[in-house]
Amino acid sequence: MDIKRTVLWVIFSFSLLMLWDNYNRYTGKPSIFFDSTTTQQAAAPAATGNNAAKTADAPTAATTAATSGANTPGVPDGAAAVKSEVITITTDLMKIGIDTAGGEVRHLELLKHHESGDESKNVVLFDENGQHTYLGQTGLIGGAYPNHKSMFAAVPGPRTLDSANQVQLVLQSEQQGVKLIKTFTFKRGEYKVDIKHDVVNNTSTAITPSLYLQLVHDGSALGGGSMFMASAFTGPAIYTEADKFQKVTFESIEKGKAEHAMKGESGWIALVQHYFVSAFVPPANTPREYFTKKLATNLYAVGTILPMGTVAPGATASMDTTMYSGPQESKRLEAVAPGFELVKDYGWLTIIAKPIFWLMMQIHQILGNWGWTIIVLTIVIKLAFFPLSAAGYRSMAKMKLVTPKMTDIRTRYKGEPQKMNAAMMELYKKEKINPIGGCFPMLVQIPVFISLYWVLLASVEIRNASWLWIHDLAAPDILFGSYHIGTFHLTIGILPILMAISMFIQTKLNPTPPDPIQAKVMMFMPIAFSVMFFFFPAGLVLYWVVNNILSIAQQWFINEKLLGGKAKA
């Protein structure tokens, strides 16, 4: 039994270690176990500046379906330099800058989401500042048509939402008789932007243009998470009905080995980062091609190409698309497009994590505070597992009663393992003890623990949520300060300390292993785990502390009441 309990602790410890390593690799940090080439390359100023994004070739339908990750020929480079204007549109949720040079989205600021630890700064998604490049580009291919390198003229109109429910920005560009009109519609309370593309054929011959939508990003991770999640994963994603949700790393694009769907009748493209996402969603039931490619050093694109059919002389063809750029709030994601909620990554235990998040949302609607929500959720989970855990604690209490007899057997048959094991089994049979019965509560909680970890890791709803002294439940508890030791960042809070104390009490309530080495290992566990929990989100540690307190109360009740206090021995 003692060996099995120790093995279980090792399994639990290894699970936490693998969870930590998985988080490191998820956020682009070096793995503890594996050597890997990081996808965060050193930024090259020439590549991430205006020239690289502006002179990058537009995609072509003929080549993107055959190759992914390679530069594709398109409109000629070296377009004449034209003075442009960045037009700023302000709504109740965001401030967005659209450049008349190319009609591209160059800046997008979320007015309701602040940088973690600095409420004076809003989260910025689209931007180009010399260190990061993040752009949204659209245009036409198939001929010398307007694209993201063409000059557009803005139609006069309001630039702020004010008291209206929507505001529009209309941009026009004509090249060799083909006019492209982009109409951006911004609505109150929405992170979705409707973008209508009208192609007017003012030539004397029919044309067959295709519309491309692409998101451009450098290979470095952006912020937007808490200090614990400072280098959260950033990368392209493609969704189709046939192939579902597919993540693509910048590293695979760099090596020309990106694997993803190439064609489809529906779906979308996105750039995913921690807590936030930007995406282009074309109309459903429209044939399209998908591509990823390297534009320049440390600069990549993910996009889609949609044929607009034949446009006769004097005729107009239109295509409505949607751009979403905002937080990964579940309700908003579900309303954007089929499968779009998958950008919120709950890891490999999604089947457990989603119900946990749903339950959290229901509780939060009643309580209105995420800290108290986590506490109530913990109580609910504990009640759900009460019958099973109670049986386990009874088994552990009985084990504590027979610990002296087990010690006597070990002493009597020292050096005779076969006789010792036989005597142990006879003791278990006589006392009606299940030697692994005490393991069940922990085994059951491990998947729930991991699932809740991913819920707290992925849920922007909890970001910057406060509870008592904690200002951000998605970041480590820093009540006693944050310290930098070289490149090492340590935060010290009361929750990990309470975690260690609760684990120590639990250890004292459990049967003491007869083996002195095992006993020392068990006593060392609270210290080891408390150090690890200094780096975990406060919300997760809060859950585990409350869970431990409830477990202690339950185990004490069983020891003192159900066994008549005999388990004290």
UniProtKB/Swiss-Prot annotation:
The lineage of its organism: Bacteria, Pseudomonadati, Pseudomonadota, Betaproteobacteria, Burkholderiales. GO terms for biological process: protein insertion into membrane; protein transport. One of its GO terms (cellular component) is plasma membrane. It comes from Herminiimonas arsenicoxydans. Pfam families: 60KD_IMP, YidC_periplas. Required for the insertion and/or proper folding and/or complex formation of integral membrane proteins into the membrane. Involved in integration of membrane proteins that insert both dependently and independently of the Sec translocase complex, as well as at least some lipoproteins. Aids folding of multispanning membrane proteins. Belongs to the OXA1/ALB3/YidC family. Type 1 subfamily. The keyword Cell inner membrane applies. Keywords: Cell inner membrane, Cell membrane, Chaperone, Membrane, Protein transport, Transmembrane, Transmembrane helix, Transport. It is a multi-pass membrane protein. It is found in: Cell inner membrane. One of its GO terms (molecular function) is membrane insertase activity. NCBIfam families: PRK01318.1-3, PRK01318.1-4, yidC_nterm, yidC_oxa1_cterm. The keyword Transmembrane applies. Interacts with the Sec translocase complex via SecD. Specifically interacts with transmembrane segments of nascent integral membrane proteins during membrane integration. Its main location: membrane. This is Membrane protein insertase YidC. The chain crosses the membrane at residues 7-24, 219-239, 299-319, 340-360, 366-386, 436-456, 485-505, 526-546. InterPro entries: Membr_insert_YidC (IPR019998), Membr_insert_YidC_N (IPR028053), YidC/ALB3/OXA1/COX18 (IPR001708), YidC/Oxa/ALB_C (IPR028055), YidC_ALB_C (IPR047196), YidC_periplasmic_sf (IPR038221).
